C-alpha cells in the first residue's frame, strides 16, 4: 500500500528518478527557466527550493552539500554567487510554474518552471510596458 508516501514515482526506478531530478535541477539553476511536464515541475520544486535556501548562507559545508546533491561545480557557483544573494530576503517560494498547454505526441500537460524575479523576465516586462 502507498499510504502516506510522498512524492511521485513517474514510472521510473529510484536511481533514474534521482538522476533525472539532479539533471533537471542543474538545468533550472543554469538557465532559470525550463519546459517540462506539470508533474515533473511540481516534483522539481521539492528539489530546487531547498538548494536555494541552502545557498542563502554561504559556507564550505553548505557548498559541499549542494555539490553532493547536484554534482555540478558550475551550478554550485551560480547558486552561491548569484541566487543565494538574490533571494536573501525572500522566505521561500523561489519558483513559479506556468502551464503552457499539451504536448503534441501524447497530450501530456506541459509547463514552464522558472525562478521568480529573474533579471531577463523583468527586462521583458519593462520593454512591453513601454
Curated annotation (Swiss-Prot):
Assembly with partners or alone: Part of the 50S ribosomal subunit. Contacts protein L32.
Q: Which InterPro entries match?
A: Ribosomal_bL17 (IPR000456), Ribosomal_bL17_CS (IPR047859), Ribosomal_bL17_sf (IPR036373)
- State the family named in the UniProt similarity comment for this chain: Belongs to the bacterial ribosomal protein bL17 family.
Entries under HAMAP family matching the protein: Ribosomal_bL17
Gene Ontology BP terms: translation
Recorded name of the encoding gene: rplQ
What is an example of a GO molecular function annotated in this UniProt entry? Answer: structural constituent of ribosome
Q: Which UniProt keywords apply?
A: Ribonucleoprotein, Ribosomal protein
On whether Translocase is a keyword of this UniProt record, the answer is no
What SUPFAM superfamilies does this protein's entry cite?
Answer: Prokaryotic ribosomal protein L17
Q: Name one Pfam family in it.
A: Ribosomal_L17
What species is this protein from? Shewanella loihica (strain ATCC BAA-1088 / PV-4)
Q: Which domain of life is it from?
A: Bacteria
The lineage, from the top, is:
Bacteria, Pseudomonadati, Pseudomonadota, Gammaproteobacteria, Alteromonadales
Q: What is this protein called?
A: Large ribosomal subunit protein bL17
Q: GO CC terms for this protein?
A: cytosolic large ribosomal subunit
